[in-house]
Amino acid sequence: METIAFRMRLHPGKQDEYRRRHDAIWPELADALRAAGISDYWIFLDDDTHHLFAVLRRPADHRIAQLAETDVMRRWWAYMADLMATGPDGRPVEKALEPMFHLE
């Protein structure tokens, strides 16, 4: 299993709605994430910068790239687009983060 992290940006004042929507994550989206190999998925917020920091685990044979092709992922991105920075294709703008330290 590999652990990866990435950063996204939430629009100011949208944290309560972001949390509300994720608290009610669609079951079919959760199923699609798991089917792609995603596990132990966390998203943290830095209130000062409005950055969201996501951390997840994935196996070597993950299918995360294929998620973008699914209807449920595209619908979720459209649903979340008013809350966060997105690219022209509607997906959240993500910046991969480099691991700097790990303690088991």
From Swiss-Prot:
**EC assignment:** 5.1.3.32
Q: Which GO terms describe its cellular component?
A: cytoplasm
Which Gene3D superfamilies does the record match to this protein? 3.30.70.100
Q: Which residues form the signal peptide?
A: none
What keywords would UniProt list here? Answer: Carbohydrate metabolism, Cytoplasm, Isomerase, Rhamnose metabolism
One of its Pfam families is rhaM
Location within or outside the cell: Cytoplasm
Isomerase: present as a keyword of the record?
A: yes
Where mainly located?
cytoplasm
Q: Where does substrate bind?
A: Y18, Y41, W76, W77
Reaction catalysed? Answer: alpha-L-rhamnose = beta-L-rhamnose
- What EC class is this? isomerase
| Metabolic or biological pathway, per its Swiss-Prot or TrEMBL entry | Carbohydrate metabolism; L-rhamnose metabolism
| Molecular function GO terms recorded | L-rhamnose mutarotase activity
Keyword Isomerase found: yes
What's any GO biological process attached to this entry?
Answer: rhamnose catabolic process
Q: Which residues form the active site?
A: H22
User: Quaternary state and partners of this protein?
Assistant: Homodimer.
Protein role: Involved in the anomeric conversion of L-rhamnose.
- Show the PANTHER family listed in the entry: L-RHAMNOSE MUTAROTASE (PTHR34389:SF2)
Q: Could you say which protein family the record assigns here?
A: Belongs to the rhamnose mutarotase family.
- HAMAP family under this entry? L_rham_rotase
Protein name, as recorded: L-rhamnose mutarotase
Q: Which organism was this protein described from?
A: Burkholderia orbicola (strain MC0-3)
Q: What is the gene name? A: rhaM
